């Protein structure tokens, strides 16, 4: 009897764990404005830069919309209507180009697009092009470190980061001025040694070096969140 109870408890525990993290993975982000900065530098960039961004997700393990996505990656390059994160301006409408793992099956590609849209919301409301590319993403094993990390999406986009250090304190009162553009479990700012987009669809290309404009982070979702997203889409309220 006691053994049966213990087995039942163990089963419930495993079930609860699977609900708590049905899908999880790594996230990278770069912006064309510094995200780790002081008020004076941020004021100098607002309305001038910060309308461009690259977002990337790599699934460590798990499923989305009932499709296993272990090891699959998707990246998005976008151009907004105003400095992203500025509370006094409207960045919408934004235009986006998606770069989907070329090793993914058609079902996986569809699920990756759904996952990215779930996280980025209105930023990916207007996708002008979806490309199949060899997307590679490497992040630190210790997720609380500030890099290094890198992401490449064929010849279209690239990110390379390094940790923040004392030389990155220019005015002495730097903070994480802008939060990440998506919901994350954990994130840290980093320096983007390279932030490049050479693809079509956005009406602009960029190559930036040495800006304090990157985030590394982790994401996860449970079954209840996925079920809610699917229900919303079925009702016509999702992307």
Feature roles, as predicted:
Residues 21, 28, 182-186:
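Folded, disulfide-stabilized extracellular/luminal domains of secretory-pathway proteins
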Residues 1-9:
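Bacterial N-terminal signal peptides that target proteins for export
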Residues 6, 40, 62-64, 105, ...:
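Generic "edge-of-domain/loop-turn" microfeature
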Residues 99-219:
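Mature, soluble, non-transmembrane domains
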Residues 11-16, 223-239:
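Short, basic, low-complexity termini and linkers enriched in Ser/Thr/Gly/Pro
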Residues 8-9, 16, 21, 153:
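Generic detector of low-complexity/intrinsically disordered segments
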Residues 31, 38, 169, 229-232:
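Secreted/extracellular small peptides and ectodomain modules produced from precursors
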Residues 22-100:
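N-terminal Sec/ER secretory leader and immediately downstream segment
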């Amino acid at each position: 009897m006691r053994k049966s109870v213990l087995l039942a408890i163990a089963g419930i525990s495993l079930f609860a764990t699977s609900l708590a993290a049905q899908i999880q993975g790594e996230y990278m982000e770069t912006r064309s404005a510094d995200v780790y900065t002081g008020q004076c530098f941020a004021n100098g960039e607002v309305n001038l830069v910060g309308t461009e961004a690259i977002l990337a997700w790599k699934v460590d393990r798990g499923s989305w919309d009932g499709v296993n996505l272990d090891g699959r990656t998707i990246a998005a390059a976008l151009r907004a209507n105003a400095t992203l994160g500025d509370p006094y301006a409207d960045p919408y409408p934004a235009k986006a180009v998606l770069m989907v793992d070329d090793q993914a099956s058609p079902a996986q590609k569809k699920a990756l697009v759904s996952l990215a849209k779930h996280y980025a919301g209105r930023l990916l409301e207007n996708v002008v092009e979806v490309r199949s590319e060899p997307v590679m993403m490497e992040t630190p094993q210790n997720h609380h470190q500030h890099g290094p990390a890198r992401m490449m999406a064929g010849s279209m986009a690239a990110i390379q980061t390094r940790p923040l250090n004392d030389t990155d304190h220019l005015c002495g009162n730097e903070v994480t001025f802008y939060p990440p553009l998506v919901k994350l479990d954990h994130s840290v700012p980093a320096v983007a040694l390279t932030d490049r987009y050479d693809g079509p669809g956005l009406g602009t290309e960029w190559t930036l070096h040495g800006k304090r404009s990157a985030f590394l982070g982790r994401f996860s979702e449970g079954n209840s969140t996925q079920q809610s997203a699917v229900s919303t889409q079925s009702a016509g309220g999702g992307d």
